[in-house]
Amino acid sequence: FPLFLSSASTSIYTQLIVIVLGFYCTTEVIGKYSSAERIMRAMCFLVYTPLNQVFFPKISTLSAKNCSEAHSLFGQVRILVLTVMAIVGVAIWTSSIWLPSVLGEDYSGLDIYLKIFALTPFAIGVGGVYGQMGLIALGNEHTSHRFRDVYFIAAIASICMMFIFIPFLQAIGASIVVTATEVVVAILMIYNYKKFSKIC
């Protein structure tokens, strides 16, 4: 259920950003921003989701049997995920240079959004590792609630930021809001994991 709430809150704030953006940008700009965000999220979850599906149940099962081994596996997975997500970020940054020329003129202008979004995969990786695998797989009902609360806080922060950045920076501001929100999630997940790191 906390995982569902996290997905729901993420979906809500990302859709709300597009709605707010509609008051300040043309449909063409919104389309380019949305394309850039979809490219970023597709690359992130194409890589992160399989890793999570493989290691989440292993860590969760192991935490009930041998806590020290579960934490050891968590540490190894953390290094793997963060390394891979950093590579994804570099790939997004690099692709921002040549993607418009490959896909055509309709995609010109995506580069600036993709360069901002290039910072997001690492933050998503941090939030995923410390949140899903740390607070949930290694945790208990209490830490699952903390996981849920992080996304509520992030959604509120996102709403506040979008009314600050979007009116002045339009789609660039929206890209900053998305990236900043994922950074907020990552920081709060690390904080809560460190706070409850002895739960297992």
Predicted regions and their residues:
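Alpha-helical transmembrane segments of polytopic membrane transporters and translocases
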Residues: P2, I17-V18, G31-Y48, L80, ...
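Interfacial/gating helices of multi-pass transporter permease domains
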Residues: L3, L21-R41, Y107-D111, A171-I176
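Transmembrane helix-bundle signature of multi-pass secondary active exporters and lipid flippases
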Residues: T10, Y33-Q53, V84-V88, F117-G125
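Membrane-interface helix-loop junctions in multi-pass transport and translocation proteins
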Residues: V29, S96, P100, A154-I187
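Helix-loop junctions and terminal segments of transmembrane helices
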Residues: A36, M40-C67, G131-A137
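C-terminal transmembrane helix end/exit motif
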Residues: L51, F55, G125-V126, G131-G134, ...
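Interfacial segments at transmembrane-helix termini and the short loops linking adjacent helices
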Residues: T94-A123, G139-E141
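Membrane-interface junctions at transmembrane-helix termini in multi-pass inner-membrane proteins
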Residues: L119-V150
